[in-house]
């Protein structure tokens, strides 16, 4: 085996020993160093959801970055993906793989540096290839999903790690931690980039129904300004089950994309509201709860009442269709991804109100057949415009449709049309323009 320990292989062949940081790997007597102090996963939300994309390794004092390289560490993780795999795979030692390390540098906080260059500090940041299959944080729990509270990330320090020398540039400094084949597990909660910036609260309707929700205000939020708001309506499994609060932000990209110009292609400030309905009662009843929350929220924050938008994933479309039909004029535009079908009555109501809608769907969606859902919704709304006397050109401006071939999905979940949809900034800019 190479100097760089293959952690996934070691776990299967000999059973990797897992230890608590600070209990081993200390330097020799008189050599300084107290070993690894903490392991802190760092997560990001990508097109197909949240995953570990870096690890912060904390030492007792400032680390000498000149002694570090990508072979200094091995990071492995579970290959489990809630979209495809049984939940038992999470802890199966045969269902693990080493991650690809893309950068190693020091920092004074457990955070990423955009330039991937070292700053003086006691944290070593180990960045990982986000396209690796391992490191997903969301897990199934019955018919729902939640963020896994016990991430399976493991770190091995393959080479000695040294402190800064007493005189800069002279030697490598005292040893902080000796090389070892022992694996470290996370010792502190993950740092969840962007997801941790949301505020997570609960709202109770006038009829006593409780709904958790998350929201994000733009940096430098100014109550004297008016901001567009995008309401994220998540899939069935992201509904609230009593113990999975906040997963509607982590499971898919829509909630966090609006804070990132690399996704939207615009620097415009946007408020995001992400309700997490309990999956009880009809879609219409759930929509009523969501609308009461939205109206209350819009009254408390500086929302542009002419720029309220809905963006849905899968089952969230049923709430959007119901709200668009029942509360005409509430939403100024809607983006329906991988959704259920709008009924004929809903299509007529939507066309009557003239609310612009863009529908996207995967050609080979394995859960919702495209011909009876995405295509049907588009055709019903378009035909309703024809019945109301609109020209084809006018209808084409008010209802749009995009269908994605398999090649548009970098993970083989053709149901999650939100992934390729949100990778197309022109669609997001269209929504904000309504």
Which positions does each model-derived feature cover?
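Gly/Ser-rich "nucleophile elbow"/oxyanion-hole loop immediately N-terminal to the catalytic nucleophile
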Residues: 220-225, 281-314
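Primarily recognizes the serine-hydrolase "nucleophile elbow" in alpha/beta-hydrolase
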Residues: 299-300, 306-351
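Short, proline-enriched alpha-helix->beta-strand connector loops that line the catalytic pocket
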Residues: 268-270, 351-357
């Amino acid at each position: 085996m190479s100097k760089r320990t293959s952690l996934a292989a070691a776990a299967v062949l000999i059973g990797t020993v897992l230890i608590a940081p600070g209990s081993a790997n200390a330097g020799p007597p008189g050599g300084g160093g107290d070993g690894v102090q903490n392991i802190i996963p760092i997560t990001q939300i990508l097109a197909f959801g949240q995953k570990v994309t870096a690890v912060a390794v904390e030492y007792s004092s400032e680390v000498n970055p000149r002694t570090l390289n990508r072979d200094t560490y091995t990071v492995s993780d579970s290959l489990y993906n809630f979209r495809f795999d049984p939940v038992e795979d999470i802890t199966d030692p045969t269902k693990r793989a080493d991650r690809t390390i893309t950068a190693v540098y020091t920092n004074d906080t457990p955070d990423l540096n955009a330039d991937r260059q070292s700053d003086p500090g006691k944290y070593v940041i180990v960045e990982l290839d986000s396209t690796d299959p391992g490191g997903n944080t969301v897990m199934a729990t019955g018919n729902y999903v939640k963020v896994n509270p016990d991430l399976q990330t493991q770190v091995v320090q393959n080479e000695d790690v040294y402190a800064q020398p007493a005189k800069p540039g002279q030697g490598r400094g005292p040893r902080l931690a000796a090389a070892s084949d022992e694996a470290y597990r996370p010792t502190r909660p993950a740092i969840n980039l962007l997801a941790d910036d949301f505020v997570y609260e609960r709202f109770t309707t006038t009829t006593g129904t409780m709904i958790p929700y998350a929201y994000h205000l733009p940096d430098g939020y100014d109550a004297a300004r008016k901001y567009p708001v995008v309401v994220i309506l998540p899939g069935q499994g992201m509904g609230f089950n009593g113990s999975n609060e906040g997963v509607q932000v982590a499971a898919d990209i829509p909630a966090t994309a609006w804070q990132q110009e690399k996704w939207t292609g615009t620097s415009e400030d946007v408020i995001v509201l992400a309700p997490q309905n309990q999956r009880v009662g009809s879609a219409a009843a759930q929509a009523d709860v969501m609308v009461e929350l939205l109206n209350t929220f819009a009254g408390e924050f500086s929302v542009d009442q002419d720029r309220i938008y809905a963006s849905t994933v899968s089952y969230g479309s049923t709430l959007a269709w119901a709200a668009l039909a029942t509360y005409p004029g509430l939403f100024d535009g809607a983006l329906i991804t991988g959704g259920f079908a709008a009924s004929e009555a809903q299509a007529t109501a939507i066309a009557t109100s003239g609310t612009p809608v863009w529908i996207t769907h995967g050609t080979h969606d394995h859960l919702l057949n495209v011909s009876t859902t995405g295509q049907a919704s588009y055709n019903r709304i378009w035909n309703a415009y024809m019945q109301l006397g609109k020209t084809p050109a006018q209808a084409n401006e008010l209802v749009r449709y995009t269908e994605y071939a398999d090649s548009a999905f970098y993970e083989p979940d053709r149901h999650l049309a939100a992934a390729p949809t949100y990778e197309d900034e022109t669609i997001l800019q269209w929504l904000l323009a309504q």
